[in-house]
Amino acid sequence: MKRTHFPYSDRSWLLLPILIISIISLTFLLSLTFTQNKSSSFEPEFSFQEPRFSFSERDYGRLPRLPRFAYSISGTKGDGPRVKRLLQAIYHPRNYYLVHLDLDASDSERFDLAKYVKAEGVIKEFGNVMVIGKADLVTYKGPTMVAATLHAVAILLKEAKDWDWFVNLSADDYPLMTQDDIVHIFSYLPRDLNFLEHTSSIGWKEYQRARPIIIDPGLYHSKKSGVFWAKEKRSLPASFKLFMGSEWVVLTKSFLDFCVWGWDNLPRTLLMYYTNFISSPEGYFHTVICNHKDYQNTTVNHDLHYIRWDNPPKQHPMTLTLEHFDDMVRSGAPFARKFAKDDDSALNKIDKELLRRSNGRFTPGGWCVGGSNSGKDPCVVYGNPNAVKPTVSSKRLEKLLVQLLDSGNFRSKQCK
């Protein structure tokens, strides 16, 4: 069978237009990519970098495995410098840090913080700090506070590996001991303990928190405003028991996994209930944990903070000053709040006497192997992050935890 052959025609004249169109398209795509990168410079990558090197876990005479903490650090307008200082004070290569300045903060504050994290050599090497670029709108006393916390938890569950406890702090917080102290003592604890102050004896809060119905405009508006109150009141719930306490918590990964994924409907049901609850961060996690049989026996009734209140208590705790320093130390708590925005004297004393930290530097620990005799930052030269050197402050934390876990205190104060 004879095949048909089509006559050859020279189509080389088509190459030039095709080449021109390709160049124009490529130029457009590159410019579009550049524009997107520029316009979304504050967008989070939602990923922690892998360290450029790794060290094996310690095995010094069969010592217990060191835990990892996942910190959420929050702030608002004007808090950028204080958030940076807090990050430096609690930084440790083993941990993870998620930093969030809410929508009230300026883009320049957020950019300055992200720029610092990106440029800091130690953080760059260990890749364990992330700044949220797309900020959440947070309304004081509203459920958007819980939403922001759950947002942070979800990111940490997705992107950070092998952490044991979640700690939420704000720009008003500061540590009273080094991370080496905390990591060392917590290495001896069961990994299923959840630290949160809680009680079902809500007293005056029944009529000022539980029965009123509030609406948080931050759920559906893009500009910040206060909550507003409905005329109607509601009765106390019958299908679950209310618990309230401090919004500052140290919670396990397994419990927070349950809160986010909720393989039964309790976390979602309570989240919907607390949408109309004033100061919901003071009750959401507490009510979830104490109404579920798998977690109600894991609670330790303490928020691991030193907080001083007026008598009778006011809406906010007292501002801590130098006169409270000795009480802070004796408390054995790893954290304290709240500190004045315009007076650093108490923080400076904590830095000098408890953290051995110089201004603008990280709190030194076993991972810092540089010399400090010449005034240089010892953490500029870093070694094995699994080498911890606890200070005398660890003994105070140990004493506090022994008291909290004593048979006479532990079970009798769980979800009561």
What residue spans do the PLM features occupy?
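ER/Golgi luminal nucleotide-sugar-dependent glycosyltransferases, focusing on the catalytic module
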Residues: 2-416
